[in-house]
Amino acid sequence: MVAFLSAWPWENFGNLKYLLYAPLAAQVVYSWVYEEDISKVLWCIHILIICGLKALVHELWSVFNNMLFVTRTLRINPKGIDFKQIDHEWHWDNYIILQAIIVSLICYMSPPLMMMINSLPLWNTKGLIALIVLHVTFSEPLYYFLHRSFHRNNYFFTHYHSFHHSSPVPHPMTAGNATLLENIILCVVAGVPLIGCCLFGVGSLSAIYGYAVMFDFMRCLGHCNVEIFSHKLFEILPVLRYLIYTPTYHSLHHQEMGTNFCLFMPLFDVLGDTQNPNSWELQKKIRLSAGERKRVPEFVFLAHGVDVMSAMHAPFVFRSFASMPYTTRIFLLPMWPFTFCVMLGMWAWSKTFLFSFYTLRNNLCQTWGVPRFGFQYFLPFATKGINDQIEAAILRADKIGVKVISLAALNKNEALNGGGTLFVNKHPDLRVRVVHGNTLTAAVILYEIPKDVNEVFLTGATSKLGRAIALYLCRRGVRVLMLTLSMERFQKIQKEAPVEFQNNLVQVTKYNAAQHCKTWIVGKWLTPREQSWAPAGTHFHQFVVPPILKFRRNCTYGDLAAMKLPKDVEGLGTCEYTMERGVVHACHAGGVVHMLEGWKHHEVGAIDVDRIDLVWEAAMKYGLSAVSSLTN
């Protein structure tokens, strides 16, 4: 049975919970449109604005927290936040709705207070002093006492406070993630100083806005998992150790739970003899080690941006959005101009940066981002700059001791760098293994084709992947219709096949040659007209970037080749572009397998057809699994 006040009344509403703000918004709109006077509903406007500011504070702290390229050396808990924690904290903003409802009810039940709020001055120095006094003498001790009680009483901790502590890695969103009862108590803790100021006649809008926003700001600070304070600050002014907590201070509370119960002021932990003795030493240690090299990743996936809209799928933009497969969202459109400007800035000044990470069997796996977008790879004058970025990333990985670096999508474009061959030839003494991952990509596509298929139509047939697929299938006795206008390139591939299988490779120059073939392997973009040649019931396997559009309703379409990471992956909380949770592109998975196997060779240039089955079996051995890509 659910404990009293442990669940939220709108728990099953989903995003419809935001309609609870509607009465306030409706009140404002009605007064503005029909009464042409909003002075009587200023309190509604203030509530809505403050709620928006509170949400913005959490979002900005989340952005900062997830900027690993800025915060990685100052992180307190080095673990990553996984999908389970993100889902657990999905409705972290319930408390903001609760506060809006409580304040609205108070205003409705107390018309004098409502009128007082509508006529508050912008600033009152006495009110600021009263606010500080009330916070220190009421809010801090009340919170400390109740927080400690929730920990020491087994019933209250088990049924209430454990919900907050079930997030293994502190995050700004963790700050608001608690039960209904705890947030009602927090409303009292944060509300009494504000109500007190108003009742004393010294309230002001600055006090209300400032305290409401700073209260959440400080809560996010304590949960941000990034030590932002310099240890020198507390050495120069030791008194600050009693007046303000640090992210390290509160992280120790989440790790050990029996100490550091204060709201914002460690003074009350000192008075209650509950301060963790390592609080300030650990804080100093983290700050001093900020310039030192942290753990070196065993594997790096070198990715790049696709387009401006998908750039907002980054975890340091909206964490919840990044934890779901990418789709274009209307609410992101207003951010497009700003993101476009950021893209231009990245083009001019940015270097390869840490994007995300996870751990697999004690191997640290990171994704680094090349600050370039898809269209830039097709600009002739941008080629050198892109290769310089990729080369710098490879050399950096080699210098710090990375074992394997895998090139994503366009970073291994044949015309750009020969599938990574350029870098391996230029730096023959590389210790890091450079991998394009296309061997596993080919394996995923090939193992998806039913065994009873005896004919396929292949576009992009003379590309690196197309060549490998054609040679593999012809050995299997499958007739491969290779779409290419180049007789020379076709014959070159045909000669690589064993003599007895060469007749299985057939050159075709037009799409109508495949009008009776129901298995299409697409390595080149198809227009609706070109797709129309496929007979009903055709399945389009594909390795073209970006994927072809699904025009045919009587056909099925495969997604890009992908694999699901093993179940024991830890700290994974970001979806890779349009992939489902825990699923990565096959070239990414290929690099992981290369690292796990400890292979010492570079996988660049042409795909070794003889290794396709070997790489597939290795992937299966480590628990990676093929992803069914059959979609209508």
Swiss-Prot record:
SUPFAM superfamilies: NAD(P)-binding Rossmann-fold domains (SSF51735). The chain crosses the membrane at residues 13-33, 41-61, 96-116, 127-147, 184-204, 298-318, 330-350. InterPro entries: CER1-like_C (IPR021940), Fatty_acid_hydroxylase (IPR006694), NAD(P)-bd_dom_sf (IPR036291), Sterol_Desaturase_Related (IPR050307). Expressed in siliques, stems, flowers and weakly in leaves. Not detected in pollen, seeds and roots, but expressed in lateral root primordia. Specifically found in the L1 layer of the shoot apical meristem and in developing trichomes. It is a multi-pass membrane protein. It is found in: Endoplasmic reticulum membrane. Pfam families: CER1-like_C, FA_hydroxylase. It comes from the Eukaryota. Residues 133-274 form the Fatty acid hydroxylase domain. GO terms for cellular component: endoplasmic reticulum membrane; membrane; plasma membrane. Belongs to the sterol desaturase family. Interacts with CER1. This is Very-long-chain aldehyde decarbonylase CER3. It comes from Arabidopsis thaliana.
